[in-house]
Amino acid sequence: MEMMSSSSSTTQVVSFRDMGMYEPFQQLSGWESPFKSDINNITSNQNNNQSSSTTLEVDARPEADDNNRVNYTSVYNNSLEAEPSSNNDQDEDRINDKMKRRLAQNREAARKSRLRKKAHVQQLEESRLKLSQLEQELVRARQQGLCVRNSSDTSYLGPAGNMNSGIAAFEMEYTHWLEEQNRRVSEIRTALQAHIGDIELKMLVDSCLNHYANLFRMKADAAKADVFFLMSGMWRTSTERFFQWIGGFRPSELLNVVMPYVEPLTDQQLLEVRNLQQSSQQAEEALSQGLDKLQQGLVESIAIQIKVVESVNHGAPMASAMENLQALESFVNQADHLRQQTLQQMSKILTTRQAARGLLALGEYFHRLRALSSLWAARPREHT
């Protein structure tokens, strides 16, 4: 069977060729040859294009992936860097705001400092003019032979022979000092009402303390000129003289006046104030006892002079009395030193605002004493 099938297939193939079944194809073979090359070229070009496109696609995909990876990495890094940069911007804004506020504060402080300097220069100029006027008045008083007494209490004219130029100068300086004191107290009152800062308030407190120091310096010069005038208190009003102690106020009295206006105090402040008050009272007692002994010694020296009045030689008792009178000047200076030390120690114990309130209370206290004296002098009197 196999041989038959193979023979039959062979027979069929031969018979088909013999029958001319492939002749048309053989006729087209002449046309097939030119198109075949074109077809082959087209096919090869298509294959080349497909292979190249495939290659491009294969090459392009990794490049795109790399670009995407780079883009994602850059975006991620930018996102990571965005938060610190925003925080840095906020920090820089806060720093810039602080610097702007600080510069504004510095400009405001400089402006206030210029205003204070301008006011201080103006005050110095006014003081210079007032001092010049006082000097001219003093010269005229000397030429006219008149002695000018304190205008705030009583005024009287005395003979030229009894006039002490040092005391006349002190009276005029003290009148000017009172005007300045009223102005400084008014400034402290205004500052406390305006609630200004502690730095500016401390400047006012120090200025007021220095003003009291000037008063003590003036009194020391007046004591050299006439210590009895200073001790008598003729340069003060009658109400002030009622409370006078060795040419001025008692330091313990100062503390009693100031204390209600500086409260509340801390425990440490209370302890220090009590110690200051105790030491001031002890110093007052020591000075008072020393003054009593001085008066007693003066009385004894004068009594000795009475016994030897008929004696020709009485120079020794008089010399002893003069020494006692010279010691009186030292007592006045020591009392003023105690007053000044009490003021300074009190200001150190208190805060700046408490010290300002204390100086305001002290200034108002003396101002009301002077006003009370004026009211007393102007009271209606019954005619008898």
UniProtKB/Swiss-Prot annotation:
Transmembrane segments: none
Gene Ontology terms: cellular component: nucleus
PROSITE patterns: BZIP, BZIP_BASIC, DOG1
Sequence ranges assigned to domain DOG1 in this UniProt record: 167-379
Domain bZIP: 96-138
One Pfam family named in its UniProt record: DOG1
Gene3D superfamilies named among the record's database cross-references: 1.20.5.170
Annotated stretches, region: Disordered: 36-70, 76-95
BP GO terms, sorted: defense response to bacterium; DNA-templated transcription; plant-type hypersensitive response; systemic acquired resistance, salicylic acid mediated signaling pathway
Basic and acidic residues composition-biased segments: 58-68
A GO MF term: calmodulin binding
Principal subcellular localisation of the protein: nucleus
Biased composition (Polar residues): 76-88
Subcellular location: Nucleus
Full protein name: Transcription factor TGA3
Taxonomic source organism: Arabidopsis thaliana
